[in-house]
């Protein structure tokens, strides 16, 4: 038995969580688990336990939504076609608040999704093979930005509980109006897609339907190890770990059906 599995014996968590973690740990290491388990052993902090529960169901044992899997698979191609807007073009608009993609994103307008376009940046002359058709790429982008808009409109679901930045690339001008260097523009594309990926896949991932059901069962009827006596305390621990929970399912018309989890009503 490895050290990580032995560490489970000291964690006062629901039996089903401990069994799930044991199965995972027997197959591979889980990033951050050992440190959190050691921290709990050292100071008995409920924060460490809360983090273990959250990471178990939202990361270590969670399944990515299909569009997130495709995002990872086609990352480079999506970066090459990532939506952008020149600050210079905003200056020439009659009504920027309704015409500018940046302004629409800033106001979390649902109209922004229909205004987006995904042409390759004009000054990117490097030829790279495309694995997606234009239609497939458009659908993929729509789902990514539908997901992002959902979170941007609900900062209480985000990891930082703060508002998210605009997800498109904004290409500024120099103080005297000249274009910025192309190398800087390329870096803007790299940073922006990395930011959106981090928000959707790492910081605030959707909870799989299976894990939502598992957590609901635990909160409704905790199963305690022999050395844990308080069901109420364990229940509250799991409730706190579910903050920010939401689910995503495919919808035949809407693309994605994204909802705040029913677990939030139990907080």
Curated annotation (Swiss-Prot):
Essential for respiratory growth and required for maintenance of mtDNA. Required for cell survival in the absence of prohibitins. It is found in: Mitochondrion. One of its GO terms (cellular component) is mitochondrion. This is Genetic interactor of prohibitin 5, mitochondrial. Its main location: mitochondrion. GO terms for biological process: mitochondrial genome maintenance. Belongs to the GEP5 family. The lineage of its organism: Eukaryota, Fungi, Dikarya, Ascomycota, Saccharomycotina.
């Amino acid at each position: 038995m490895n050290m990580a599995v032995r560490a489970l014996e000291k964690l006062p968590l629901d039996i089903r969580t401990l069994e799930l973690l044991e199965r995972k740990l027997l197959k591979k290491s889980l990033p951050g688990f050992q440190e959190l388990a050691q921290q709990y052993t050292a100071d008995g902090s409920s924060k460490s336990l809360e983090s273990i529960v959250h990471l178990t169901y939202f990361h270590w044992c969670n399944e990515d939504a299909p569009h997130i899997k495709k995002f990872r698979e086609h990352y480079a191609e999506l970066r090459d076609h990532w939506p952008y807007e020149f600050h210079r073009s905003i200056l020439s608009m009659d009504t920027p608040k309704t015409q500018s993609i940046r302004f629409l994103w800033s106001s979390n307008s649902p109209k922004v999704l229909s205004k987006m376009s995904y042409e390759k940046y004009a000054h990117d002359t490097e030829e790279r093979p495309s694995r997606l058709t234009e239609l497939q790429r458009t659908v993929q982008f729509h789902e990514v930005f539908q997901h992002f808009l959902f979170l941007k409109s609900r900062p209480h679901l985000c990891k930082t509980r703060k508002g998210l930045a605009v997800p498109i690339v904004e290409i500024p001008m120099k103080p005297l109006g000249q274009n910025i260097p192309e190398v800087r523009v390329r870096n803007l594309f790299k940073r922006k897609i990395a930011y959106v990926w981090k928000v959707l896949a790492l910081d605030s991932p959707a909870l799989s339907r299976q894990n939502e059901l598992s957590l609901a069962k635990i909160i409704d009827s905790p199963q305690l190890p022999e050395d844990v006596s308080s069901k109420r305390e364990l229940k509250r621990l799991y409730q706190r770990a579910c903050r920010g929970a939401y689910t995503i399912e495919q919808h035949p018309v809407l693309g994605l059906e994204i909802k705040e989890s029913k677990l939030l009503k139990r907080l």
